[in-house]
């Protein structure tokens, strides 16, 4: 078994991801209060994506006590994967060897769209994939820890067919994941922590996109990471981000009226 994929022997025991012992610093240098205010501005437009900022995601993960559940949500946050893409992941889809660990995601939405245009099942070997770097060392370490603790196999026998298949890391449904999120949101609310946007599996995808834009990732690169067929799908995030850029320039329109009158008189 290659050392480049997740395996129990390479597990590193570290404190829980986003634990209280970590320094309280933002992963991307942003003005968090200003970013919150600007997001409130964007929420006026129903067509714009609803997203969480990094501190909110970390706070939400704090209320997910189970490591297996926590790492699924962390995977959505760290990769921007669609929920069906994340639930399809196996250990072999991850390459965690330094210096550039990454995950290979099957771009399932594009596959579905293509299948709808053609008769029959999509031929094997033609499934679209994309590589997403895993740049957060805490995430990588916790993923290794989870696999080691839960002894997640590379393969398992399908009880229905009797065939040996690649074992999915998260053998759950979309509905189950939504239940996990709902329980975390409820636990946070009971502790006095609330979120101003509804949290669903897709919220993490939107949050990933906005986080990457805040980090300065070019739009074309983000398109590739998100698995968007058209750049127009990615550009929707810049409509939100444009509010931040414009606000930070603090463009002034007013000047003392008496000074303006004096200036015009001098020029005439």
Curated annotation (Swiss-Prot):
Similarity comment: Belongs to the 'phage' integrase family.
Query: What protein does this entry describe?
Result: Resolvase
- What does UniProt list as catalytic? 82, 114, 202, 205, 228, 237
Gene Ontology process terms (BP): DNA integration; DNA recombination
Please describe what this protein does: Acts as a repressor of transcription and as a site-specific resolvase that cleaves at the RfsF site.
Give the Gene Ontology MF terms in alphabetical order: DNA binding
Q: Which UniProt keywords apply?
A: DNA integration, DNA recombination, Plasmid, Repressor, Transcription, Transcription regulation
Q: What PROSITE patterns is this protein classified in?
A: TYR_RECOMBINASE (PS51898)
Instruction: Note whether Transcription occurs among the keywords.
Output: yes
Provide the leader sequence positions: none
Question: Taking every annotated instance into account, which residue ranges of this chain make up the domain Tyr recombinase?
Answer: 47-250
| Top-level taxon | Bacteria
Q: Which InterPro entries match?
A: DNA_brk_join_enz, Integrase-like_cat_sf, Integrase_catalytic, Resolvase_Rsv, Tyrosine_recombinase_XerCD
């Amino acid at each position: 078994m290659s050392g480049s994929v997740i395996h129990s022997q390479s597990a590193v025991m570290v404190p829980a991801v986003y634990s209280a012992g970590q320094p309280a610093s933002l992963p991307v240098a942003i003005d968090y209060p200003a970013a919150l205010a600007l997001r409130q501005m964007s929420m006026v437009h129903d067509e714009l994506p609803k997203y969480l900022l990094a501190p909110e995601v970390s706070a939400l993960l704090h209320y997910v006590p189970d490591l297996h559940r926590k790492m699924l949500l962390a995977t959505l946050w760290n990769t921007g994967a669609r929920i069906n893409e994340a639930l399809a992941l196996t250990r072999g889809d991850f390459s965690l060897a330094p210096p550039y660990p990454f995950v290979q995601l099957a771009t399932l939405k594009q596959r579905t769209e293509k299948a709808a245009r053609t008769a029959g099942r999509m031929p094997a070997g033609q499934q679209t994939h994309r590589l997403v770097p895993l740049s957060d060392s805490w995430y990588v370490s916790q993923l290794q820890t989870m696999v080691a603790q839960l002894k997640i196999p590379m393969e398992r026998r399908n009880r229905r067919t009797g065939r040996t298949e690649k074992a999915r890391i998260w053998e759950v449904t979309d509905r189950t994941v939504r239940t996990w999120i709902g329980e975390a949101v409820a636990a946070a609310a009971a502790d006095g922590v609330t979120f101003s946007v509804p949290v669903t599996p897709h919220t993490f995808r939107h949050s990933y996109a906005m986080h990457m834009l805040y980090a300065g990732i070019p739009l074309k690169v983000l398109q590739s990471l998100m698995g968007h067929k058209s750049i127009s799908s990615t550009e929707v995030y810049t409509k939100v981000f444009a509010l931040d850029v414009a606000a930070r320039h603090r463009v002034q329109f007013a000047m003392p009226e008496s000074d303006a009158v004096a200036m015009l008189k001098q020029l005439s």
